[in-house]
């Protein structure tokens, strides 16, 4: 596997870096009304205006027809900047799955170049990314009726459409459709999130995507999640390295102390390992290969190791790490939200253990305890 960025990936990274330099600072985000969801609407508009949101779209919609490998690079840059915008949700949870599943997808994508948000309802109560969702989609005349309950639906209130995994496939639902109830839920980063109740929500036949749609959505979502998480790890490590190189104690930078330098090194290894896992997952998906193991390994590393690195980096900042006008807390809080979205370390280890047991032809149960 060649880890050198292609010319397209390098161009995406350069464009993303340039646009993300205008992201709202931690101080600016802290000044927003924190009784409401907090996200960078100004940056989101610029991402649309600069064509960043159109990168994976078909040429018929003015896009560049790029895939998960290039979107993964973009999300890594979003993570490095700790930008509070729904690029992950719109491209990773929405555009890429819709394009992969085909059908009548373009009608749901038409508003994305102008800044429409897409998202997915990946989790159910007590069941993160379930392979067999409890939410149902029952045939009714020339359409379907969707009933169920989803949790941790990011940017649901702001979205034009939500991809909803069901027993029959992935339903594309408008969040303001009759029968949909959204209830705001708390996030560590204060980014928008809701519980989504669906009570007999009608959709037309073209709004139900089948053919292994739930697994396709989950694989792309996990690869995208891991890419952004890798960027968060890299961004926090870089911020910490800069801090410990300039913060002096006992007459010299604290980076000169072995205990500090070892913790920075540990954080670096965590971020690079997650980047490797995410890159591998994106590459396999882009090549049409089985990426189940790669996405599950990346999700486990995200859930198990990235929070430890974030805690270490925050600790090395001292009291500054808890200052909401300083960027360190953004990386930590966004990481907490992503860990919760994938289900936490015990859940991910159980999934990974079951996958290994299946490959070995044995039954097994795993726990991180």
Model-based region annotation:
Residues 114-127:
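A short, Trp-centered hydrophobic/proline-enriched beta-strand micro-motif
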Residues 1-79, 219-369:
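Alpha-helical interface subdomain recognition
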Residues 131-147:
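Cytochrome P450 C-terminal beta-domain/meander region
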Residues 98-102, 138, 164-167, 172-175, ...:
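Short beta-strand-to-turn element immediately C-terminal to the catalytic PLP-Schiff-base lysine
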Residues 134, 152-155, 175-207, 211-213:
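Flexible, small-/acidic-enriched active-site or ligand-binding loops
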């Amino acid at each position: 596997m060649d880890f050198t960025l292609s010319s397209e990936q390098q161009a995406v990274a350069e464009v993303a870096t340039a646009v993300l330099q205008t992201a709202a600072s931690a101080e600016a985000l802290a000044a927003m009304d924190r009784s409401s969801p907090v996200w960078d609407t100004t940056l989101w508009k610029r991402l649309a205006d600069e064509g960043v949101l159109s990168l994976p779209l078909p040429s018929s919609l003015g896009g560049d027809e790029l895939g998960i490998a290039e979107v993964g690079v973009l999300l890594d840059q979003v993570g490095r900047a700790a930008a509070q915008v729904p690029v992950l949700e719109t491209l990773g949870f929405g555009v890429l799955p819709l394009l992969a599943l085909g059908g009548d997808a373009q009608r749901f994508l038409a508003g994305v170049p102008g800044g429409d948000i897409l998202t997915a309802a990946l989790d159910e109560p007590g069941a993160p990314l379930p392979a067999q969702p409890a939410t149902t989609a029952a045939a009714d005349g020339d359409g379907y009726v969707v009933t169920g309950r989803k949790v941790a639906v990011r940017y649901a209130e702001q979205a034009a459409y939500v991809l909803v995994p069901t027993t029959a496939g992935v339903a594309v639902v408008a969040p303001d459709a009759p029968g949909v109830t959204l209830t705001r839920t708390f996030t560590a980063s204060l980014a928008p999130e809701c519980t989504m109740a669906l009570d007999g929500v009608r959709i037309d036949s073209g709004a139900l995507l089948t053919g292994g749609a739930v697994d396709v959505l989950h694989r792309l979502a996990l690869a995208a999640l891991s890419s952004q998480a890798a960027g968060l790890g890299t961004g926090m490590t870089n911020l910490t390295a800069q801090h410990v190189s300039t913060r002096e104690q006992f007459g010299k930078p604290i980076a000169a102390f072995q205990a500090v330098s070892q913790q920075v090194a540990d954080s670096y290894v965590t971020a690079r390992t997650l980047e490797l896992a995410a890159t591998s997952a994106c590459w396999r998906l882009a090549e049409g290969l089985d990426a189940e193991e790669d996405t599950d390994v990346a999700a486990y590393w995200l859930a198990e190791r990235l929070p430890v690195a974030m805690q270490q980096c925050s600790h090395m900042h001292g009291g500054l790490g808890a200052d909401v006008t300083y960027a360190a807390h953004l990386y930590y809080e966004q990481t907490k939200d992503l860990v919760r979205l994938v289900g936490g370390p015990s859940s991910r280890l159980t999934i990974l253990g079951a996958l290994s047991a299946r490959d070995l032809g044995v039954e097994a149960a795993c726990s991180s305890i």
